[in-house]
Amino acid sequence: MYGLILSRFNNCGYHCYETILIDVFDILSKYMDDIDMIDNENKTLLYYAVDVNNIQFAKRLLEYGASVTTSRSIINTAIQKSSYQRENKTRIVDLLLSYHPTLETMIDAFNRDIRYLYPEPLFACIRYALILDDDFPSKVSMISPVIIRN
């Protein structure tokens, strides 16, 4: 499937390719038992769509019920790929976050190598993780006096 997501049809540009891929997927999805099926490398279709930064295909997979928590490295991959974009750095990250990954998925994303990445996608994930953390308001009250004193 990775080759299908990466390959481009010869006679049309990228936009045409994306449309054809989504049309083919719409037809094939009727015959799929599990949209989150995992290949022999433990990766899902959503992982591959994120890996090649195919936002429209990732969005379609999510609309069909693909889970952002099935493959633990999806969020981390999105953060890394977003860091290489010149424009709309957080677009793929924001898309994935809009489908509510679990706090465990967010923690796992930050347990991977993120040292050399641009801050925008990281900040989006941190904001989302803080929203999920039930204890965060109490942590803010502990941090605020320290910030005010300095």
From Swiss-Prot:
ANK repeats (start-end): 41-73
Name of the featured protein: Ankyrin repeat protein C18/B24
UniProt keywords, alphabetically: ANK repeat
Origin: domain of life: Viruses
InterPro entries: Ankyrin_rpt, Ankyrin_rpt-contain_sf
